[in-house]
From Swiss-Prot:
UniProt domain GH18: residue ranges: 235-522
Reaction(s) the record says it catalyses: Random endo-hydrolysis of N-acetyl-beta-D-glucosaminide (1->4)-beta-linkages in chitin and chitodextrins
GO biological process, one term: chitin catabolic process
Family: Belongs to the glycosyl hydrolase 18 family. Chitinase class V subfamily.
Originating gene: chi11
Glycosylation sites: N148, N275, N455, N519
Keywords tagged on the record: Carbohydrate metabolism, Chitin degradation, Chitin-binding, Glycoprotein, Glycosidase, Hydrolase, Polysaccharide degradation, Secreted, Signal, Virulence
UniProt GO cellular component terms: extracellular region
Chain's role: Secreted chitinase involved in the degradation of chitin, a component of the cell walls of fungi and exoskeletal elements of some animals (including worms and arthropods). Participates in the infection process and directly acts in the penetration process of the host cuticle.
GO molecular function: chitin binding; endochitinase activity
InterPro entries: GH18_Chitinase (IPR052750), Glyco_hydro18_cat (IPR001223), Glycoside_hydrolase_SF (IPR017853)
Compartment list: Secreted
Signal peptide bounds: 1-24
Name the UniProt record assigns to this protein: Endochitinase 11
Length: 522
């Protein structure tokens, strides 16, 4: 990279905030390595950038929502770190996101589990506190080790705070809803014979009114910028990942023309607060790299998009409202003209139950919406794996998806970074150590998916599997994926007729020194 008349190389992944000042040649905390002074030819070709200001791709800056303020139609506000747009004029103390909570624990309850409380149990009362059944009622919610207060572990019970209980007399005599009354938060009312509790300060909003605020991202002109795919997405495909957050990405059309690589997986869309972005640095509306997608599609190729990844937070973690999350997924597919959508669930997020359930609920909702519109959008989940198969956390992601009715086209696994001694492969070119770890992982994955889908044939299970190794030097020290490993993995994929083969990543598919770990070489 050229910056301020100096050539730098990145030592690891860098984001938009990692501006290459003039660092010391050796600094373990600096992602940039100073190489040399730029030549006159390089300065003539690339110019001499001296600032790190970039086009944010259309990121919206909106004022924070104020409940005491009225809004005109088409107003855009920021609320709980997401943008919302109202379709109609709004009075003060009108809608926020949820005006009333219908019957949430408004009936008198005794301590102890509800007799019908199962895996789908909403809540029950324990010693004056509401508890939510995240997984199952079989574990005692009174025991702290079984509680999941922050949603960051896999325990089954989440405390919801102090319960609100009312006598039958209080419920029956609750004041009838009056649109002219300004209700404080947590006020009990009665509307059409049903009790409700206001979730915020409210006026002129009845429990039956439809909320006019909708999650909002400015997609103006995006559909035209990315072009439209000319062909259906293949049932069996090589779709290497493209790190779409890099300042420079490969020419996708040239790769299609010169190497017959026609399909790619773009990574990653993540949340900045609760809004959709490309790697947090770029907005979704007018991203400069969209022209490469359009050129590829005009040449007959196509892309799928991956949401998540190892860095930053996935949308399912930051966007707490399932309907908003569903709308994000719908808008991404609609405005980028996608036929396939991938969810890369890794790192700590593969074990955060709240985001797992929220994602699966939103995917089910958006799939139902697509079906009602006659659209066939394929959904893939990408998960970390060991040579012995998916981890319990990964299996939980898939089990929860099945329980919620999500229909997966496939499960792609990251056959990389195992952290297992048997996969140490530095200086073992030709022994296929890393390749054997990958094929072992796929064999175990087949058994695991067969257990989840016993009615599918072996061929159908193979067709819904994908393998994505990290070419060259992996993040885990001592793990290297060689060309001989690639041949073994491809042979196994062809034998099984896998649904997908990928690599991380196309930008890294270049030679480098054995110990060199970069996002632009392998």
């Amino acid at each position: 990279m050229l910056f301020s008349m100096v050539m730098f190389t990145e030592r690891w992944w860098v984001g938009s905030k990692d501006c290459p000042r003039v660092p010391a040649l050796e600094n373990s905390n600096n992602p940039w390595r100073l190489e040399r002074t730029a030549t006159a030819a390089e300065l003539s070709q690339y110019g001499n950038p001296t600032t790190c200001e970039i086009d944010n791709g259309g990121v919206i800056v909106a004022d924070g929502f104020q409940a005491s303020k009225g809004y005109t139609g088409d107003s855009i506000v920021d609320y709980n770190d997401a943008h919302y747009k109202t379709s109609v004029d709004q009075d003060a103390w009108g809608f926020v996101r949820a005006a009333y909570n219908r019957g949430r624990n408004t009936n008198r309850q005794s301590s102890g589990p509800h007799p019908l409380c199962t895996r789908k149990c909403i809540a029950w009362l324990l010693m004056g506190r509401l508890m939510n059944a995240v997984l199952t009622q079989s574990d005692n919610p009174a025991l702290v080790p079984n509680q999941n207060a922050t949603g960051s572990n896999s325990r089954p019970w989440k405390p919801l705070g102090k319960a609100q209980s009312y006598s039958n007399e209080e419920l029956n005599n609750a004041p009838q809803f009056n649109p002219e009354t300004l209700y404080a938060s947590d006020t009990l009312i009665r509307f059409n014979g049903v009790n409700y509790i206001s979730q915020s300060k409210e006026q002129k909003v009845s429990p039956s009114d439809s909320n006019p605020w909708r999650v909002f991202v400015d997609w103006t002109g995006t559909k035209e910028r990315v072009g439209t795919p000319k062909k259906a997405w293949p049932k069996h495909v090589y779709a290497p990942y493209v790190d779409f957050t890099l300042n420079t990405i490969p020419d996708l059309r040239a790769l299609a023309k010169n190497h017959n690589v026609n399909h790619f997986t773009l990574a990653f869309v993540v949340s900045k607060d609760a809004n959709t972005t490309c790697g947090t640095a770029y907005g979704m509306q007018n991203y400069a790299q969209y022209s490469k997608i359009k050129a590829l599609r005009e040449a007959g190729g196509d892309v799928m998009l991956s949401i998540g990844g190892a860095n930053n937070a996935p949308l399912a973690a930051s966007c707490k409202n399932v309907d908003d999350l569903m709308q994000h997924y719908y808008d991404i597919v609609d405005n980028l003209n996608l036929k396939v959508l991938d969810f890369d669930i890794e790192g700590t997020w593969v074990a955060v139950q709240a985001s797992i359930e929220r994602r699966n609920l939103a995917v089910k909702k958006v799939q139902d919406k697509w079906k009602s519109e006659g659209k066939d959008i394929a959904i893939w989940y990408t998960l970390p794996i060991l040579p012995t198969g998916l981890t319990p956390e990964g299996m939980n992601v898939l089990s929860d998806a099945k329980a919620k009715g999500v229909e997966l086209a496939g499960v792609n696994v990251m056959t990389m970074d195992y952290g297992n001694a048997i996969c140490q492969s530095a200086n073992t070119e030709g022994q296929n150590i890393h390749g054997k770890c990958a094929t072992s992982a796929i064999a175990f994955l087949h058994s695991q998916l067969k257990g989840l889908h016993p009615n599918k044939s072996d061929a159908e299970i193979d067709a819904m599997m994908g393998t994505t190794p990290m070419v060259g030097v992996n993040d885990v020290q001592g793990e290297v994926f060689y060309l001989s490993d690639a041949r073994l993995v491809m042979q196994d994929a062809q034998k099984r007729n896998l649904g997908m083969v990928g690599i991380w990543s196309i930008a890294r598919d270049l030679p480098a020194a054995l110990t060199c770990l970069r996002n632009s070489t392998a």
